[in-house]
Structures are given as structure tokens and as C-alpha cells.
């Protein structure tokens, strides 16, 4: 429990580069609460944009990884170099989403769930935000896959074997993803969204720009290189795989991968992270509400500091 003489105030002039764990949680709840204030149309636009960003960077990651999948090069560096390059390129998507204020379903599983647990959004608002976010991400990722990745022919199968390494790289990724068992896929998806939600938490905790970039980059890189399953990234990757006729089927994509990945991602954000954080920091948020009037400010421009009645702690 917070000390009786402790309160939370909004200090826009703070020079601190990071928040305490209590402050970070308060910012997370406020961030989740703000999602419900947007109209459905704005939410959809933000979600589509996030899906496009995931598609843009997944495309770039596929090309970069595929270049190192060239069979003669693999003799010297091995296939692991392709995975390293793929993972190193993909985090740019999350930096794009953060800097533009776009809306990603997987991050919402933490932030909006904490707001729901505190009663800051209703069950109906919660379902609205989560469904629009997922649908918009799907539309954005699949649209980019069709109009840019498929339309450009970047991943198409080539007649010459020496030029077929990019197609083969994507094919091998897709085949691996659909050959997990249902339970394996859920477990990999849980691991993935722990990293993604922590990346969101880092953004809310770290106020220094370079520190935020590094923390987000390595959190996302960790899940990408580990082979975890991310629903929005998989929506892009597996749908472009279907479009270019790789060795996967529609049933495998949607029922052996996307469905369990969705379940696992939600479990990670809502149950593995949101519920324990709510249990640990619930009293701090309640105290924050009692001691402070709503500021109406933007979370990007304010700092929540802990101060007592006599001055800064």
C-alpha cells in the first residue's frame, strides 16, 4: 500500500528519464482508458495503419532474410544468418506504430485490459476496441501483402533455382509455422506477446527517446529471433504465402496457426501480464485517482511523479 502522505501529481517539467514501476502502471491504465474515447472510425483507421506498418517491415524482413538464404551463401554462414537479419529488421514496425500513434491489437491486450479491470472502460467498450483493432490490423496487413508484396512480385517463385532463395525463405517460414501443434503454437504466441506488451510498457516507462528506441528494439528483436508467433505478423506472412502458392493451405494457415496464435497472444497480454499487474499495483492507481483531478493531458507530454506533502521523495 502507498504511504498515507504519498500522492501522485502531474509534473510536465520532470527531468527524470524513466518512471517508477507504480508510475508506469498508472500510465498504462490511462493509456488503455484513452483508447475507448476514440470513435470507431478513428480506431479503425489507426488499426489499419498499424497493420500496414507490420506489413511494410515484414516485407523488408523477408527480403533481407531471403538474401542470406541464397544456397551458396548458406554453405558459409548457415541459415541462422537469415533468421538474425530477419529479426534485426522487423522491430522497425513497432517504432513506426509508436511514433505515429497507430493501434496494435497485441499491445491492447495489456493496456485496455488493465483499464477494464479498473472499471475505466465498460465490457462493451472493451469488446469494441479489441475487435476493431484486430479487424483493422488484419485489413492493413493483408492489403499491403496483396497490393505491394504480391503486386510487386518480390516473393514470387523464379524459374531459375539460383534466383529462388527469397521465395524459398518465405516458404520455409510458412511451412514451419503451420506445422506446430495447436498447443505449441499457443505457447509460442504467449512468449511473443509478453515481449510485445513489455515493449509497450517500456514506451510508457521511459521518457528518453534513445532509451525508448533501444528498449523497444531489443524486446521485439528477442521475440522475432526466438521464433515466437505474433498474430499480426503472421497474418501478413501467411497470407502472402498463400498468394504466391507456397506449400501451405488456407486451412493450415487459419486453423493451425492464426487461431492458436490469437489465443496465445491474448492470454499473454490479458492473463499473464494485466491480471498480475492489476493485483500488485491496484492500490496505487486507486490512490492516484483519489489524490488527483483528471488532467485531460496527453500521456506523451506529461510525467507522473511521486511526491509527498513536504516535497519530492
UniProtKB/Swiss-Prot annotation:
Stated name of the protein: Formate-nitrite transporter
Taxonomy, superkingdom: Eukaryota
GO biological process: nitrite transport
Main localization of the protein described in the UniProt heading: membrane
Residue ranges that the UniProt entry lists as topological domain Cytoplasmic: 1-47, 99-128, 207-211, 282-313
Topology relative to the membrane: Multi-pass membrane protein
Short name of any one Pfam family annotated for the protein: Form_Nir_trans
Keyword presence, Transmembrane helix: yes
Topological domain spans for side Extracellular: 69-77, 150-185, 233-260
Family: Belongs to the FNT transporter (TC 1.A.16) family.
Activity regulation remarks: Inhibited by the Malaria Box compound MMV007839 and its derivatives BH296 and BH267.meta.
Gene name per UniProt: FNT
Key words of the record: Cell membrane, Glycoprotein, Membrane, Transmembrane, Transmembrane helix, Transport, Vacuole
Membrane-spanning intervals of the chain: 48-68, 78-98, 129-149, 186-206, 212-232, 261-281
Role description: Monocarboxylate-proton symporter that mediates the efflux of the waste product lactate in the intraerythrocytic parasites; active in acidic-to-neutral pH range. Transports L-lactate.
GO CC aspect terms: plasma membrane; vacuolar membrane
Record's catalysed reaction(s): (S)-lactate(in) + H(+)(in) = (S)-lactate(out) + H(+)(out); formate(in) + H(+)(in) = formate(out) + H(+)(out); pyruvate(out) + H(+)(out) = pyruvate(in) + H(+)(in); acetate(out) + H(+)(out) = acetate(in) + H(+)(in)
GO MF assignments: high-affinity secondary active nitrite transmembrane transporter activity
Family matches, as NCBIfam families: fnt
Residues annotated as glycosylated: 179, 239
Entry's localization field: Cell membrane; Vacuole membrane
DNA damage keyword on record: no
Quaternary state and interactors: Homopentamer.
Amino acid at each position: 500500500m502507498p504511504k498515507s502522505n504519498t500522492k501522485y501529481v502531474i509534473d510536465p517539467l520532470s527531468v527524470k528519464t524513466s518512471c517508477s514501476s507504480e508510475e508506469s502502471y498508472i500510465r498504462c491504465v490511462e493509456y488503455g482508458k484513452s483508447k475507448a474515447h476514440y470513435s470507431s472510425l478513428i480506431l479503425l483507421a489507426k488499426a489499419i495503419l498499424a497493420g500496414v506498418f507490420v506489413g511494410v517491415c515484414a516485407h523488408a524482413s523477408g527480403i533481407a532474410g531471403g538474401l542470406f538464404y541464397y544456397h551458396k551463401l548458406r554453405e558459409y554462414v548457415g541459415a541462422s544468418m537469415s533468421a538474425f537479419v530477419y529479426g534485426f529488421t522487423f522491430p522497425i514496425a513497432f517504432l513506426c506504430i509508436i511514433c505515429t500513434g497507430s493501434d496494435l491489437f497485441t499491445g491492447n491486450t495489456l493496456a485496455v485490459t488493465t483499464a477494464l479491470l479498473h472499471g475505466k472502460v465498460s465490457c462493451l467498450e472493451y469488446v469494441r476496441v479489441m475487435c476493431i483493432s484486430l479487424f483493422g490490423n488484419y485489413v492493413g496487413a493483408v492489403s499491403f501483402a496483396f497490393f505491394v508484396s504480391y503486386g510487386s512480385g518480390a516473393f514470387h517463385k523464379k524459374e531459375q533455382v539460383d534466383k529462388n532463395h527469397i521465395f524459398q525463405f518465405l516458404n520455409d517460414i510458412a511451412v514451419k509455422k503451420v506445422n506446430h501443434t495447436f498447443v505449441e503454437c499457443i505457447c509460442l504466441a504467449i512468449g511473443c506477446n509478453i515481449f510485445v506488451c513489455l515493449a509497450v510498457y517500456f514506451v510508457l516507462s521511459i521518457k528518453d527517446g534513445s532509451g525508448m528506441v533501444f528498449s523497444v528494439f531489443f524486446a521485439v528483436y528477442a521475440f522475432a529471433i526466438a521464433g515466437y508467433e505474433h498474430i499480426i505478423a503472421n497474418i501478413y506472412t501467411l497470407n502472402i504465402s498463400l498468394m504466391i502458392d507456397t506449400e501451405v493451405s488456407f486451412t493450415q494457415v487459419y486453423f493451425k496457426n492464426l487461431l492458436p496464435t490469437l489465443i496465445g497472444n491474448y492470454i499473454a497480454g490479458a492473463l499473464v501480464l494485466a491480471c498480475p499487474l492489476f493485483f500488485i499495483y491496484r492500490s496505487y492507481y486507486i490512490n492516484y485517482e483519489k489524490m488527483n483531478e483528471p488532467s485531460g493531458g496527453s500521456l506523451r507530454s506529461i510525467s507522473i511523479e511521486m511526491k509527498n506533502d513536504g516535497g519530492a521523495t
